[in-house]
């Protein structure tokens, strides 16, 4: 039925967007395949020109940063003061904000969108409301309910969807560490955001290999790598950026210089060693605000530099406030 096809396609698109799965339509330079972890902000880090939006989103989270942009400077500073108290209370409650406490707060903010996305998925998938998400619940919520042997008989490209279903089940089994076919919230998070969990690394690599390894020899050849980035038209000259990608493949992707990528090289490419982004931002905020250079921040130091930490009507960029909260 057409309604089932439309609903299933919408669910798949929404969930696969949320999962951060490697996209078979990765754009130039292959950025869609590289998992850098959760970014602190998509805004440019441009403090030199008085643009503190990156810092605001790193410190508050994107949605809350928008809320602050609608406050008066006085309201913004008052709420920042309460955040400072919470940061110190979560640490050693000594009246100062240490580098570790600042980093912990930013890391907490960084993970908020993951928690929110998992909560939304949990509500969708836990159809019997028993506090767990079974594989059958997830499968039926995503793909629709079918009798055995009739899977996808009513949709176009049934074989593609059968492969997607098998791939999702394999990922679910890896995320389901206790093997009971019921996902806890932590296990569902691993299923939805595998790049955040070391034990999911192999499945991310396997899925990437399956997408790129067209001749099924277990490796990614340079032409397979390029084909994922660029589809040439007949007679079209290869763009300069594609030639640059070939060089990138040779110089930086193919670590053992055998002309192809094995599983470990694919893993190093799509899941590179990550920088501790919260620590980098915490050091930056500490450096910019620690006026007495004692290696920690007082509440007064933070409030005196409040426009770097948070925004207000005086520093906003014209965003419309889409939701309201009295407290964080």
From Swiss-Prot:
Positions that bind Ca(2+) 1: 92, 94, 96, 101
Ligand binding (Ca(2+) 6): 290, 292, 294, 296, 301
Protein's job: Probable molecular chaperone assisting protein biosynthesis and transport in the endoplasmic reticulum. Required for the proper biosynthesis and transport of pulmonary surfactant-associated protein A/SP-A, pulmonary surfactant-associated protein D/SP-D and the lipid transporter ABCA3. By regulating both the proper expression and the degradation through the endoplasmic reticulum-associated protein degradation pathway of these proteins plays a crucial role in pulmonary surfactant homeostasis. Has an anti-fibrotic activity by negatively regulating the secretion of type I and type III collagens.
PTM notes: N-glycosylated.
The protein, known as: Reticulocalbin-3
Biological processes, Gene Ontology terms: collagen biosynthetic process; ERAD pathway; lung epithelium development; phospholipid homeostasis; positive regulation of peptidase activity; protein secretion; protein transport; regulation of phosphatidylinositol 3-kinase/protein kinase B signal transduction
Keywords: Calcium, Chaperone, Endoplasmic reticulum, Glycoprotein, Metal-binding, Repeat, Signal
Domain EF-hand: 75-112, 113-148, 163-198, 200-235, 241-276, 277-312
Residues the record marks as carrying a glycan: 140
Organism this protein belongs to: Rattus norvegicus
Subcellular location: Endoplasmic reticulum lumen
């Amino acid at each position: 039925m057409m309604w089932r096809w439309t609903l299933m396609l919408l669910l798949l698109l929404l969930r696969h967007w949320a999962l951060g799965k490697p996209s078979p339509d990765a754009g130039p330079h292959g950025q869609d395949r590289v998992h850098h972890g959760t970014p602190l902000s998509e805004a440019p880090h441009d403090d030199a020109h008085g643009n503190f939006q990156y810092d605001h989103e790193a410190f508050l989270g994107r949605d809350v940063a928008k809320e602050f942009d609608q406050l008066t400077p006085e309201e913004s500073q008052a709420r920042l003061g309460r955040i400072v108290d919470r940061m110190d209370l979560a640490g050693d409650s000594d009246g100062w904000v240490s580098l570790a406490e600042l980093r912990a707060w930013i890391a907490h903010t960084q993970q908020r969108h993951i928690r929110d996305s998992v909560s939304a998925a949990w509500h969708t998938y836990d159809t019997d409301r028993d506090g767990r998400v079974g594989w059958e619940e997830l499968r039926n919520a995503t793909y629709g309910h079918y009798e055995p042997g009739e899977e996808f008989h009513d949709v176009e490209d049934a074989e593609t969807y059968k492969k997607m279903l098998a791939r999702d089940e394999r990922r679910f089994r890896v995320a389901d560490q206790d093997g009971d076919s019921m996902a806890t919230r932590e296990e569902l998070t691993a299923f939805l955001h595998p790049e955040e969990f070391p034990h999911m690394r192999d499945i991310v690599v396997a899925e990437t290999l399956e997408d790129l390894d067209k001749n099924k020899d277990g490796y990614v050849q340079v032409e397979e790598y390029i084909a994922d980035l660029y589809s040439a038209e007949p007679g079209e000259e290869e763009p300069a950026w594609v030639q640059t990608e070939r060089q990138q493949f040779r110089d930086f992707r193919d670590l053992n210089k055998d002309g192809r990528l094995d599983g470990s090289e694919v893993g190093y490419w799509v899941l590179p060693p990550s920088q501790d982004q919260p620590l980098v931002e915490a050091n930056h905020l500490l450096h910019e605000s620690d006026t007495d250079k004692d290696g920690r921040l007082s509440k007064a130091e933070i409030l005196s530099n409040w426009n770097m930490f948070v925004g207000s009507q005086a520093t906003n960029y014209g965003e419309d406030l889409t939701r309201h909260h009295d407290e964080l």
